[in-house]
Amino acid sequence: MPQDIDFGLPAPAGISPGLEATRRHNLGWVRRLGLVGDGPSLAWYTSWDMPRLAACGFPHARGAALDLCADAMAFFFVFDDQFDGPLGRDPARAARVCRRLTGIVHGAGPGPGADACSAAFADVWARSTDGAHPGWVARTAHEWEYYFAAQAHEAINRLRGTPGDMESYLQVRRGIAGTDLPLSLGERAAGITVPAAAFHSPQLRIMREAAIDVTLMCNDVYSLEKEEARGDMDNLVLVIEHARRCTRDEAVTAARGEVARRVIRFEQLAREVPALCAQLGLSAVERAHVDTYLGVMEAWMSGYHAWQTQTRRYTGAPHVLPSTGPGYFDEVLPT
């Protein structure tokens, strides 16, 4: 597994205080809601260190906000693993299961006797939206819908058995990675709301997409061995290998180039943002929110990168959960 690949991303600028308190909260939360059982399941989950990811990726978060970020990360990864088995090779079942989750986004509620994933997501969504700006709720609801809907398309790609083209890969991968959602969670955790005129400017839209792609592309390299063994096709290295008919080393080098180009573009556009804010006539408070949001995006890229290069989720997966079986100990998303 190419865990020693260096993408040249900066170290995290900071880490949220209160990490140990959030560790205690998060462990209690996943057990109370049934996301994680006892024994090997609990030991495996604990080794991922979701609270550390939250503290590094969301340095603006404090207290309950940091707890929410850690719980959201726990949901993401436990939910994702449920598709590393029969469900992930059955597009119709995947779509049906994910409709339940999408219904929660649109107000349906999990219902009595809900499965652990539905109950956990309902809790995360309720806490995220409590007191949030309506604009934030609207666009974050769309992001969750995209995330859930993309699961069926990843299943379709697994059945195809060969990587797709770059454009199709990005459409599915951006969905299943859900990496636009941490940016929105980071915005919420920082206590800001980016003005719509700035949020939808070419500069911030391109920067946001770059931050999303950097995160998922680095992850594709670090999780390559795990994903290839399970027949996943939506991986940047595999897509490049297939399209260019090149070697593994050449594909990894090309993947690093894709990341580097996006980091450079992000930095270029960041320098344009002060003038953009002036042109839009933003107030001092609004400009401060935009500036903080740039920090949110930077923190997520560097914080996630720092976490994924150390977590046992990627270094230990082939030994803990061999690819001959499902990628989880507990089935918490019944169909």
From Swiss-Prot:
Signal peptide: none
Motif (DDXXD motif): 80-84
Pfam families: Terpene_syn_C_2
Catalysed transformations (reactions): (2E,6E)-farnesyl diphosphate + H2O = avermitilol + diphosphate
Membrane spanning residue stretches: none
Positions that bind Mg(2+) 2: 80, 84
Entry note: cofactor: Binds 3 Mg(2+) ions per subunit.
SUPFAM superfamilies: Terpenoid synthases
The EC number(s) this enzyme carries: 4.2.3.96
Record's keyword annotation contains S-adenosyl-L-methionine: no
Top-level taxon of the source organism: Bacteria
Binding-site list for Mg(2+) 1: 80, 84
Major enzyme class: lyase
Alphabetized UniProt keyword annotations: Lyase, Magnesium, Metal-binding
The keyword Cell membrane appears for this protein: no
GO MF assignments: metal ion binding; terpene synthase activity
Similarity remark: Belongs to the terpene synthase family.
Function in brief: Catalyzes the cyclization of farnesyl diphosphate to avermitilol.
Other notes: The recombinent enzyme produces avermitilol (85%), accompanied by small quantities of germacrene A, germacrene B and viridiflorol.
Record's protein name: Avermitilol synthase
Organism lineage string: Bacteria, Bacillati, Actinomycetota, Actinomycetes, Kitasatosporales
